[in-house]
Regions:
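Preference for extracellular/luminal or secreted protein segments
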Residues: 124, 145-415
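Second-shell residues forming the walls of enzyme active-site clefts
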Residues: 22-186, 193
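Structural recognition of the beta-strand scaffold that forms the well-ordered cores
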Residues: 1-2, 44-49, 91-96, 130-134, ...
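A short, well-structured edge-of-sheet supersecondary motif
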Residues: 194, 427-443
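Short, basic/aromatic recognition patches
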Residues: 411-431
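Short, conserved phosphate-binding/catalytic loop or strand-edge motifs used
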Residues: 3-14
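Short glycine/proline- and charge-enriched loop/turn segments
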Residues: 13-19, 61-67, 352
Length: 443
């Protein structure tokens, strides 16, 4: 399993939400915990992209990013999580396609093909003894180099990932062995290392995966509950000006809900909000005329509370509306997208009374966010990476409910599958007229 380490640039086009965050210490802790869990379950963890792809604004799938930092900066920031992963004994490392002038002086030579980076730094200086992978060799960040598989092996990599033309790459490696540029011992050593990891991971004993019932085994009630709880725990209230949250339950007062994107994507939110307050739903369409935008702004201005629900990631078509949307009434922004998307409407978000980051628009998350707004559910998430000048790393306001609104069986050591069977028996008795209704007590 390939694990992206760290991102500190919110404009990073390729790592962004795949990283554990911005702070090197927190990233190291989370990577080690996650990777150790993988390896205890028989999955090799591979940390990437060495020596660090987080603070770049270029996608290495399309070009070669540059890390123009001093060695001191690399040691304290980019390299720190990798060093900790090595100390923890994690098994795999992927070298990225990056230009690191302070380590590799040859201009345009990617770190994945640099012996200074792969062997001298990773293997020798940092004493990494595990499997070393290249990033995909078909990527534009490395594609301009000839015989990339050969160069990667000579640099010290053990495995080359997705070379483009094996008919040319393999003969080039064989020719290099004949010329003494690579030794047979080099290749055999790499092969033994690969076979050793296969043995340690138990691949010799494991049978083929049984496809029958695979989906049910993977998506067990316990797994679904874990995913649900992780998603809900990530909900983050980024700010709460003048303690606008929690909102008061009041059916007499109507709150405006502005849905940015396909209105159907936030139906779960609207339905849950309607349990606590009267709701007037409005939809903002992409590329509306200024006349329609102003009419919508005027309509929203008549409400004392405005909730803006964003499920669309591409917000450029909506920028003309938000450029002039600074309502006098408190506006609460809900983002069911990765956090970096709010930077596209930064001015409007900066004026918001409250901002809640849900990360995804799953129905569970939408319902939980609605509950959080009315303090029917808790939220104590913290931002793992800063969002430009809007919010720093660690931003997060705690919302604590007075009384939990609902419960999930797995949270209390029960099985939802067993409870469904009990429900089925109870409902069957009602259908057959054995009793008009019933209550079930689980002891």
């Amino acid at each position: 399993n390939l694990i992206s380490m760290r991102v500190i640039n919110p404009e990073n086009p390729v790592i962004n939400t795949r990283s554990f965050g911005e702070d090197p210490i927190q990233v190291a802790d989370k990577v080690i915990a996650y990777a150790s869990g993988l390896e205890s379950g028989g999955v090799l963890s591979v940390c990437k992209h060495f020596p660090g792809h987080g603070d770049t604004d270029v996608d290495s799938h399309k070009a070669l990013p540059v890390l123009p930092f001093t060695r001191e900066r690399l040691d304290s920031v980019e390299l720190y999580p990798f060093k900790e992963a090595i100390r923890a004994g994690l098994g795999g490392m992927m070298v990225g396609h990056l230009q690191v002038p302070v380590i590799e002086p040859i201009g345009g030579l990617p770190s994945s093909l640099s012996r200074n980076v792969v062997y001298d730094l990773l293997t020798d200086e940092l004493a990494f003894k595990g499997l070393i992978f290249t990033d995909a060799l078909a990527m534009k960040g490395v594609a301009g180099n000839g015989n990339v598989s050969l160069q990667a092996l000579k640099a010290g990599n053990d495995m080359v990932l997705s070379p483009r033309n094996l008919k040319e790459e393999i003969p080039a490696v064989l020719e290099a062995i004949e010329k003494g540029e690579l030794t047979r011992e080099d290749i055999e050593s790499k092969c033994r290392k690969v076979l050793t990891y296969k043995y340690v991971l138990g691949l010799k004993k494991k049978s083929y995966v049984q496809l029958s019932g695979l989906e049910q085994r993977i998506n067990s009630p316990q797994t679904r509950d874990l995913v649900r709880r992780l998603n809900l725990a990530a909900i983050t209230v980024l700010n709460n000006k003048n303690h606008i949250l929690p909102l008061h339950t009041d059916k007499e007062q109507t709150i405006a809900l502005l849905e940015v994107g396909d209105p159907g994507e936030t139906d779960a939110l609207a339905k849950q909000l309607s349990r606590y307050t009267s709701l007037a739903r409005f939809s903002l369409r992409a590329n509306q005329t200024e006349e329609k935008n102003q009419r919508l702004r005027d309509s929203l201005s008549t409400y004392k509370r405005i909730i803006v629900a964003v499920s669309e990631q591409r917000l450029a078509p909506y920028q003309p509306f938000f450029a002039k949307f600074v309502p006098e009434s408190p506006a609460i922004y809900l983002f069911f997208t990765p956090g970096k998307m709010m930077l596209q409407i930064q001015r409007a978000v900066a004026h918001a009374s409250a901002v809640v980051l849900g990360h995804s628009y799953s129905s569970d998350v939408q319902r939980q966010v609605a509950d959080v707004l009315f303090a029917k559910a808790s939220a104590d998430g913290q931002l793992s990476a800063s969002l430009g000048e809007l919010f720093p790393t660690g931003a997060g306001v705690t919302i604590t409910p007075k009384t939990p609104l609902h419960f999930v069986p797995e949270e209390y050591g029960l099985s939802s599958a067993h409870l469904k069977r009990i429900d089925s028996i109870a409902l069957d008795g009602i259908r057959q007229g054995a009793y008009p209704g019933c209550q079930v007590v689980v002891l």
